[in-house]
């Protein structure tokens, strides 16, 4: 009986690996062709009627996108902008629903959206949808002149004014040299060239990212950002100057 069980497991492993060997090249070609079409203007991101700032990453795993979105939203609100946030609502019960966040429970909108709501101004509008273009257009119609895309780096269907990419300790992992499902990368590292700003997060866990860019900033966000509404502005540790002074 044990021999049969082992044989079945080996066959399952063989089938799984065979499927991955087939899927990986197809996935890689899709990423390459999609980016090529956008880079040469064959496909174009759609404008939504407001300035758009995307906060994303290039690897799987948490790099602090939501806390950074919170800090940026609060900074912009404080400086007179009407801010809207687009979130897919990861972990919510019904992912097909599209709605402006009001009094929905965490089950309806996802825990990340609740974190956004509890740590931003009451005037900041949050739209939950898988369709980022639709959500951003709705926020623009509601009077938002700046829309933040939470996790939007790979979503090129929407035109953006600023692309912010967060790099955490995950980016030092050897798995980051390979594309998912063989590694942690969502797309090859060469596509970081699309980023206007790269930010190193979780600096206490990072030795050296290897990036040598004038637009690379060391980011320090206090831990209270995850549990408190009193969020400090983000500063460049090298010069202590306030960030997010974008010409919008």
Regions found by a protein language model. Name each.
Residues 90-92, 96-208:
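Phosphate/Mg2+-binding loops and adjacent switch elements
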Residues 2-51:
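A transmembrane-helix-recognition feature enriched in membrane-embedded lipid enzymes
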């Amino acid at each position: 009986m044990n021999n049969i069980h082992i044989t079945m497991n080996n066959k399952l492993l063989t089938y799984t690996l065979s499927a991955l060997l087939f899927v990986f090249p197809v996935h890689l070609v899709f990423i390459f062709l999609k980016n090529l079409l956008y880079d040469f203007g064959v496909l174009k991101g759609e404008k939504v009627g407001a300035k758009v700032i995307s906060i994303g990453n290039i690897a799987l795993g948490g790099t602090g996108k939501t806390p950074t979105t919170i800090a940026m939203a609060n900074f912009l609100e404080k400086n007179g902008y009407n801010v809207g946030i687009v979130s897919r609502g990861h972990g919510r019960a019904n992912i097909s629903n599209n709605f402006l966040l009001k009094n929905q429970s965490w089950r309806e909108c996802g825990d990340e959206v609740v974190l956004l709501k509890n740590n931003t101004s009451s005037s900041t509008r949050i739209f939950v949808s898988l369709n980022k273009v639709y959500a951003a257009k709705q926020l623009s119609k509601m009077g938002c002149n700046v829309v933040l895309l939470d996790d939007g780096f790979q979503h090129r269907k929407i035109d953006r004014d600023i692309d912010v990419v967060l790099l955490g300790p995950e980016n030092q992992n050897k798995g980051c040299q390979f594309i998912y499902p063989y590694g942690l990368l969502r797309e090859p590292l060469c596509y970081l060239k699309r980023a206007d700003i790269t930010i190193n997060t979780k600096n206490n866990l990072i030795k050296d990212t290897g990036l040598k860019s004038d637009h690379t900033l060391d980011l320090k966000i206090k831990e209270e950002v995850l549990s408190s509404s009193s969020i400090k502005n983000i500063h460049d540790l090298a010069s202590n100057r306030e960030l997010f002074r974008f010409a919008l």
